[in-house]
Amino acid sequence: MELSALQQLVKERYFKTDSERGIFHTALWFHEEVGELSSAIASGDKENAKEEFADVLMWLLTLANLMEVDIQQAVDAYLENPRKNPAK
């Protein structure tokens, strides 16, 4: 699935609830998921880490939706930025 399609899917499924929760509380959920991912990585629990990677991605897309950021455009701009490319 392409990133833009995934962002749209997240919007269709969760935008109403996410909007009601608000950006601040949604950001707190995102931080909690990042913490859970960090714990899974630190403990070497690959199976749990896989689940947490997905959680973090979904919450990131949720935040992007709430802020009306097209994540595909943001990623494309990042990749085109010469300062973000590793030195050769």
Model-derived features: positions:
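Flexible "arm" and connector segments at domain edges
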Residues: 1-53, 57-88
